[in-house]
From Swiss-Prot:
It holds the Pfam family eIF-5a. One of its GO terms (biological process) is translational elongation. Residues 1-21 are annotated as: Disordered. Belongs to the eIF-5A family. GO terms for molecular function: ribosome binding; RNA binding; translation elongation factor activity; translation initiation factor activity. This is Eukaryotic translation initiation factor 5A-3. CDD domains: S1_eIF5A. Residues 1-12 have a biased composition (Basic and acidic residues). The keyword Ribonucleoprotein does not apply. Keywords: Hypusine, Initiation factor, Protein biosynthesis. InterPro entries: IF5A-like, IF5A-like_N, NA-bd_OB-fold, Rib_uL2_dom2, Trans_elong_IF5A_hypusine_site, Transl_elong_IF5A_C, Translation_prot_SH3-like_sf.
Length: 159
């Protein structure tokens, strides 16, 4: 035993992996995949037949779930791909700060203050207008691979 103090930093994911492996041939449309290090939703999958010297290949066309950018990848169908753990959580909107951060109410009564307003113009104006009108708003937050972003809005009526 030493007399030194050991610092322990608590992490929310407790060391859990941000992705899990899945065989390329089993990933379907509307599933998720990691392409170029980004979590994506698959919008199109096509497979090519086995060639003279190789495997059948899967061609994935996917949209980055946070930026909306289109990405493509070609992987042998027998190989494993990384699939992100994607979670959706609903929070009640409490406040919008001057600097573009939102204050959200979690299920256990705590506040979550580390999220920015979304960059999508339509969603942004819906949130700002609804909040200005004093409506009770619930935002849906998508999280994957250590990133979080507001991606939907629900109006639960006037306060």
């Amino acid at each position: 035993m030493s007399d030194e103090e050991h610092q322990f930093e608590s992490k929310a994911d407790a060391g859990a992996s941000k992705t899990y492996p899945q065989q390329a041939g089993t990933i379907r449309k509307n599933g998720y995949i990691v392409i170029k290090g980004r979590p994506c939703k698959v919008v199109e999958v096509s497979t090519s037949k086995t060639g003279k010297h190789g495997h059948a290949k899967c061609h994935f066309v996917a949209i980055d779930i946070f930026t909306g950018k289109k990405l493509e990848d070609i992987v042998p169908s027998s190989h494993n791909c990384d699939v992100p753990h994607v979670n959706r959580t609903d929070y009640q909107l409490i406040d919008i700060s001057e600097d573009g951060f939102v204050s959200l109410l979690t299920d256990n009564g705590n506040t979550k203050d580390d999220l920015r307003l979304p960059t999508d113009e339509n969603l942004l104006s819906l949130i700002k207008d609804g909040f200005a009108e004093g409506k009770d708003l619930v935002v849906s937050v998508m999280s994957a691979m250590g990133e979080e972003q507001i991606n939907a809005l629900k109006d639960i009526g006037p306060k």
